C-alpha cells in the first residue's frame, strides 16, 4: 500500500505545485467563497437513512488502475442524472487523471446536472486541493488515512469544514480507524480493497464495523456488486454504500441502481460491455 501511495503522492505533489503556479491560493479561495453553497453531503445521507432507505453514494468513474477503462461511453451529466433517477443519495466523481482518467470538469458537469451533493474523489495531500474542490462546487472531499499522517489529515479536514464541506474518512484497518475517530468528521468509509493486491472482500467491513461508534455514518466501499451485498453489510450496521464500477458497466444505469437498492434482492445486475450506452426509462 505504501509503495502505491508513495507513487501517487509524488505525481499529486507535482500537480499541486503546477496548479498553485497557475492560480494562487487567494484566487482559488475567492472562487470557493463565491461558489454555490454546499448541499449537505452527510445531512442528505442521514435523511435517507432516517426514512428507512439505503443511502447510495453513486460513483462517476471512467477508469481505474486495476481494471483500466470501465466505460468508453462516458458522459458525466447523463450518468449523474441516471443515478439520481435510480435513487442515489449522493454522487462521487473521480477527478484524478493519471490513475482514473478523471477531471474536475467531470465533477462540475455531474453536479450541475443534478440536485445531489457531490464528493470530489481524489487523493488529497494539500489544503489547496480542498479549496480547489469547493471552488469547483464540491460538497465533500475524501481523506485517505493511509496516505496522510495525523497532522495532515487534521489540517485537510479543518480546511473542508471551514468551507462548509463534509469529509469522508477512508480506512482499511483498525489502526487507521482509531486515527480517524480522533477527527471531527462523522462519516467513516471502510474500503474493502487491499491496495497491495487490489483484491476485495466484504469481510474487511464486517471486521471493522463493530468498532465504529453507532453515531457515525459508516460507508461500505469497494467489492459491492449486488443487493445481497448491501443486505450482508446491513447486518453489521452499514447502510450507506459507495458503488462505482458495477453500476458504471450497466447499459441502463437507472434500472441497475434501482435493482441494487431494492431490499430483499439477491441477484447481481447483468453486466454489459463498458462501451454500452446510458439509457434512462
Curated annotation (Swiss-Prot):
Top-level class of the enzyme under EC nomenclature: lyase
Entry similarity comment: Belongs to the TrpC family.
Enzyme Commission code(s) on record: 4.1.1.48
NCBIfam families: PRK00278.1-2 (NF001370), PRK00278.1-6 (NF001373), PRK00278.2-4 (NF001377)
Highest rank taxon of the organism: Bacteria
Record pathway: Amino-acid biosynthesis; L-tryptophan biosynthesis; L-tryptophan from chorismate: step 4/5
Keywords: Amino-acid biosynthesis, Aromatic amino acid biosynthesis, Decarboxylase, Lyase, Tryptophan biosynthesis
InterPro entries (UniProt xref): Aldolase_TIM (IPR013785), Indole-3-glycerol_P_synth (IPR045186), Indole-3-glycerol_P_synth_dom (IPR013798), Indole-3-GlycerolPSynthase_CS (IPR001468), RibuloseP-bd_barrel (IPR011060)
Protein's recorded name: Indole-3-glycerol phosphate synthase
Catalytic activity: 1-(2-carboxyphenylamino)-1-deoxy-D-ribulose 5-phosphate + H(+) = (1S,2R)-1-C-(indol-3-yl)glycerol 3-phosphate + CO2 + H2O
Key word Cell division present: no
Taxon lineage: Bacteria, Pseudomonadati, Pseudomonadota, Alphaproteobacteria, Hyphomicrobiales
Gene Ontology biological process terms from the UniProt entry: L-tryptophan biosynthetic process
Encoding gene (name): trpC
Keyword Lyase among record annotations: yes
A single GO molecular function term of this UniProt record: phosphoribosylanthranilate isomerase activity
